[in-house]
């Protein structure tokens, strides 16, 4: 993929908005578990868990539940081996917030729900995303959104983090 450049969106500011939302929720005594979608969502979740002083967080790898698994092939397998699903909490009856970097079609979230339900039956599942591109193919929406962004269909947002752990989005051309 060819890198086009930085996106107008301030990913770090959007992260802080989501952190504040969860901080307020934690102050009310509301219990929840965080589970990030590999890769970008897991980075966000790891940082949220640290900033909120949470004992643990989960990672969900959707590789084996993707509806385009046949197309992704070895790429999906590499992702699954680099960051496998790990849920260090009881899923049954839990209030779980799924976290991802970008919401576009909803297909990755559908795959994440399938993977999550392989581990149990949560009481509630909410979705938090850093960027919402608003181009659904499935009836899925986020409960918490850092920022809504407009990006041409032939481009993708790629979350990056610097050495200090700060986030930014790069814009790349979609591979055909």
Please provide the spans of the model-predicted regions.
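Active-site-facing substrate-recognition patch
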Residues: 1-31
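Short, well-ordered secondary-structure micro-motifs
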Residues: 46-47, 68-72, 137-142
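Residues at the starts of beta-strands that form the adenosine-phosphate
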Residues: 31-33, 56, 95, 124-127
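Short, glycine/charge-rich flexible loops or terminal/linker lids adjacent to PRPP-binding catalytic cores
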Residues: 56-96
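Internal catalytic-core helix/loop-beta-alpha segment
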Residues: 84-117
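Substrate-recognition/cap helix-loop segment adjacent to the acidic, metal-dependent catalytic center
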Residues: 46-58
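PRPP-dependent phosphoribosyltransferase catalytic core
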Residues: 2, 114-176
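Gly/Ser/Thr-rich loops at beta-strand to alpha-helix junctions
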Residues: 35-43
């Amino acid at each position: 993929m060819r890198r086009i450049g930085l996106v107008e969106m301030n990913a770090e500011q959007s992260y802080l908005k989501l952190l504040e939302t969860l901080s307020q929720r934690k102050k009310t005594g509301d219990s929840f578990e965080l589970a990030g979608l590999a890769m970008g969502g897991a980075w966000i979740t790891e940082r949220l868990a640290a900033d909120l002083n949470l004992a643990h967080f989960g990672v969900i790898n959707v590789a084996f539940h993707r509806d385009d698994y046949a197309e992704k092939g070895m790429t999906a397998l590499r992702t699954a081996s680099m960051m496998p699903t790990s849920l260090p909490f009881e899923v049954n009856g839990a209030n779980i917030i799924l976290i991802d970097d970008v919401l576009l079609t909803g297909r990755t979230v559908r795959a994440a729900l399938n993977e999550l339900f392989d581990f149990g039956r949560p009481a509630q599942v909410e979705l938090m995303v850093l960027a919402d591109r608003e181009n659904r193919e499935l009836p899925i929406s986020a409960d918490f959104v850092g920022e809504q962004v407009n990006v041409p269909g032939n481009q993708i947002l790629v979350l990056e983090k610097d050495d200090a752990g700060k986030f930014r989005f790069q814009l790349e051309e979609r591979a055909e």
